[in-house]
């Protein structure tokens, strides 16, 4: 089974352009399915729609969230379609399997004043010129300024940054490339990092990576999450959040400032406008909360 998983993983990476995070999740889902088959004394050849439904029912019975069920369904549908093309399955048992709709919840976002305080905290922490503090300042500034995903941030190379025009070239989901602008505060953080931070950490293993870990290798997602969590935690009253929370906040603040929905969609790299529209609900919900607190006849 491992050889099959390795080949499927290669297909997801090279032909589908799936991210490392998605591929890891899909392979974990398939290992769960294979273990379920083994417990029943079955093999891949015995995979049927009924078996898949039983597996998903067992997953739900174990307390899995609807988002997990939706992802597992997507994973197995992608796998069985590929397996049919590879001749590993005679027919596609998942063709009629419905992907459950994940219940959308409004993401936690920072208020604009909280976001500014978080950026100020990161800037203050970098005043002594510590390379890691300079890096962490750039992490939060770029994430909030551009709204890019943390995986996209960690994948950036130095050459992806156009400092003169304050633009960053991003390789997003499905290997789709987009260009996102950033403002002067992020440009200042970038300059400080390139001049005083990166040079102190760069090694032969650094390559062209923009952001580096303490040992000079390309920064990983886990380290970036830690930097964001610690920075936001310094802001009184701010919700606990990681990089995706800064992405949510950037999108919400753009819309609150009057940005066009389709422009925000392009900046975030959303393939569907419906995904971006979630942030309009966040903005409206925040306006309603302010109205209810402040208006005498709310």
Swiss-Prot record:
Keywords, in A-Z order: Cell cycle, Cell division, Chromosome partition, Cytoplasm, DNA integration, DNA recombination, DNA-binding
Annotated Tyr recombinase domain residues: 105-292
Active site: 149, 173, 244, 247, 270, 279 (o-(3'-phospho-dna)-tyrosine intermediate)
Residue ranges occupied by any Core-binding (CB) domain in the UniProt entry: 1-84
Function (record text): Site-specific tyrosine recombinase, which acts by catalyzing the cutting and rejoining of the recombining DNA molecules. The XerC-XerD complex is essential to convert dimers of the bacterial chromosome into monomers to permit their segregation at cell division. It also contributes to the segregational stability of plasmids.
CDD domains, alphabetized: INT_XerDC_C (cd00798)
Subunit record text: Forms a cyclic heterotetrameric complex composed of two molecules of XerC and two molecules of XerD.
Family matches, as InterPro entries: CB, DNA_brk_join_enz, Integrase-like_cat_sf, Integrase_catalytic, Integrase_recombinase_N, Integrase_SAM-like_N, Tyrosine_recombinase_XerC/XerD, Tyrosine_recombinase_XerCD
HAMAP family to which the protein is assigned, alphabetical: Recomb_XerC_XerD
Subcellular location per the Swiss-Prot or TrEMBL entry: Cytoplasm
Species whose genome carries this gene: Mycobacterium tuberculosis (strain ATCC 25618 / H37Rv)
The name this protein goes by in its record: Tyrosine recombinase XerC
Family: Belongs to the 'phage' integrase family. XerC subfamily.
GO cellular component, one term: cytoplasm
Organism phylogeny: Bacteria, Bacillati, Actinomycetota, Actinomycetes, Mycobacteriales
GO molecular function: DNA binding; site-specific recombinase activity; tyrosine-based site-specific recombinase activity
GO terms (BP aspect): cell division; chromosome segregation; DNA recombination; DNA transposition
